[in-house]
Amino acid sequence: MIKSFKDKNLEKCWRTNQCNKFRTDLVRRVLMKLDLMDAATCLDDLKNPPSNRLHPLHGPEYKNCWAISVNGPWRLIFCFENEGIFDVRLEQYH
């Protein structure tokens, strides 16, 4: 379950469907992935579909953080702890 967002525009998009801050070609997939994340009770729940490409992030600033693919270089980044998913944000790799 999603507990918090690091990106307030992303939170607004998910909660209200007011997504004018994001590229229109990404919105549908981002919202679908956020719904999957909110329904997840453990990390294994995010391994399917395989196109999520769930993977851990490395580095001191990414302790307990993971990413799933959205589209091309876009990823949803989040931290996972027993209580749920925290600090969700959308980032473009590269």
Regions found by a protein language model. Name each.
Residues 5-9, 17, 41, 49-52, ...:
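Residue-level signal for pocket-adjacent positions within structured domains
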Residues 25-51:
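Short, solvent-exposed, low-complexity loop/linker segments
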Residues 15, 19, 35, 39-42, ...:
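Generic surface-pattern signal
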Residues 57-61, 66-94:
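Enriched for short, Lys/Arg-rich terminal
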Residues 42-66:
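A short, surface-exposed loop/turn module that caps and links secondary-structure elements
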Residues 1-33:
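Arg/Lys-rich, positively charged N-terminal/basic patches that mediate binding to nucleic acids
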